[in-house]
Amino acid sequence: MDGFDKTMKFSIQDEKQSVHVNDVLLTVYDALQEKGYNPINQIVGYLLSGDPAYIPRHKDARSIIRKLERDELIEELVKSYLKHHREE
């Protein structure tokens, strides 16, 4: 019965961990462009408001972008911007 006295750890791969921000943004960008929208305006609208209506269902873009939290998307955008524009 020693096995029952120990606390076991259960680990499950979170679906969000397997989703890459870069892939999400590029897929959503392409879907918006194909539908004739201004991708930057639509993505910014979604990030600021949280309203998924800014993102079309085309190419499953709406469900893809909702796999990540908005703050995760914003964090990665800021990191990427600073990485590419920072002078050291």
Swiss-Prot record:
InterPro entries from the UniProt entry: IreB (IPR009309)
Please give one Pfam family short name.
IreB
Q: What is the superkingdom listed in this entry's lineage? A: Bacteria
Fetch the HAMAP family from UniProt. UPF0297
Q: Which family does it belong to?
A: Belongs to the UPF0297 family.
PANTHER family according to UniProt: UPF0297 PROTEIN YRZL
How is this protein named in the record?
UPF0297 protein BC_4382
Q: Which organism is it from?
A: Bacillus cereus (strain ATCC 14579 / DSM 31 / CCUG 7414 / JCM 2152 / NBRC 15305 / NCIMB 9373 / NCTC 2599 / NRRL B-3711)
